[in-house]
């Protein structure tokens, strides 16, 4: 079992959680919640150089939303349509740190499999309004993207909710509030965890969960996934050093019967589409083939 020091060395997020936990215990100050969220989600607005190359017909738009203080804020959406107009549409929910500019290669891999891709940058990320994200704001932004998904894809069984890492928790929460066939066709999650408390505790011991419990964030996917009534695809790499595969398996065990679980040998946290492109493609092609089959 890796030591606490080894885990801390590997993950800046987990190091940050421990720092926050110690600070909160020492100071006992609720105002540190904002700092905790900054360190948990590590929002990035930076654009990489060079910028990703978009295809003709791709769109980047900003949607107006109300901020917590009543001001107007913006949520950035990307639309990457498939050449096949009959293709299903995948709602792409990303994880911490990397905004959509840095998620573009994975989004393209999913488009190449056979999806049109609608993606959202939560506020604090990419071209969206720069704020310190929270679970509440992230879920609200996912709802904004959901409304656009419904507009873009009128056939409910061709809507797929997808999330990577933290985005998997967002996707599970969203799916738990919708219904198969009525609202969407399937849920797919990649490299995600059972709960934020479990993630912190598995890597740094007792201080990690303390940091989470002293913040306003939970992302309890264990509780939410039991409410999902659609087909579920779960992928996880056995070399994931950000979200241990044990947490993916724990989530799998709590999922409804029939959930499809795929472990990628030597698979990393963010590059399963590159670590095992054939297996990755086959998993999603199988998902596409099953859509609308039981309507």
Question: What is the predicted function of each stretch?
Answer:
Residues 239-243, 270-271:
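Acidic catalytic loop of the alpha/beta-hydrolase fold
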Residues 267-278:
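Catalytic histidine-centered segment of alpha/beta-hydrolase-like enzymes
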Residues 71-148, 152:
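Membrane-embedded segments
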Residues 154-165:
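Alpha/beta-hydrolase fold nucleophile elbow
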Residues 106, 230, 244-253:
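Short alpha-helix in the alpha/beta-hydrolase fold that links the catalytic acid
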Residues 24-67:
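An N-terminal hydrophobic leader/cap segment in hydrolases
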Residues 170-230, 273:
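Hydrolase active-site cap/lid region
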Residues 228-229, 234-236, 240:
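Short beta-strand/loop motif that positions the catalytic acidic residue
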């Amino acid at each position: 079992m890796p030591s606490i020091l080894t885990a801390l060395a590997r993950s800046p997020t987990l190091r940050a959680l421990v720092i926050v936990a110690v600070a909160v215990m020492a100071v006992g100050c609720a105002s540190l919640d904002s700092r905790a969220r900054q360190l948990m989600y590590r929002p990035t607005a930076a654009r990489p150089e060079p910028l990703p190359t978009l295809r003709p017909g791709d769109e980047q738009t900003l949607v107006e939303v109300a901020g917590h203080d009543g001001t107007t804020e913006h949520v950035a959406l990307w639309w990457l349509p498939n050449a096949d107009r009959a293709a299903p549409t995948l709602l792409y929910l990303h994880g911490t740190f990397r905004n959509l500019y840095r998620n573009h290669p994975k989004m393209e891999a999913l488009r190449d499999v056979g999806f049109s891709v609608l993606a959202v940058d939560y506020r604090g990320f990419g071209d969206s309004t720069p704020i310190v994200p929270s679970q509440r704001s992230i879920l609200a932004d996912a709802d904004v993207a959901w409304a656009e998904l419904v507009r873009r894809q009128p056939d409910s069984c061709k809507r797929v909710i997808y999330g990577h890492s933290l985005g998997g928790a967002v996707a599970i929460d969203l799916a738990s509030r919708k219904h198969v066939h009525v609202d969407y066709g399937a849920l797919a999650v990649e490299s995600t965890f059972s709960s934020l408390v479990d993630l912190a505790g598995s890597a740094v011991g007792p201080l990690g969960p303390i940091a989470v419990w002293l913040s306003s964030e939970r992302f309890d996917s264990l509780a939410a996934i039991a409410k999902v009534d659609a087909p579920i695809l779960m992928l996880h790499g056995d070399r994931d050093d950000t979200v241990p595969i044990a947490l993916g398996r724990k989530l799998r065990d709590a999922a409804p019967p029939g959930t499809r679980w795929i472990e990628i040998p030597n698979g990393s946290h963010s590059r399963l589409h590159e670590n095992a492109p054939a297996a990755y493609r086959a998993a999603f092609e199988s998902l596409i083939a099953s859509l609308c089959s039981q309507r």
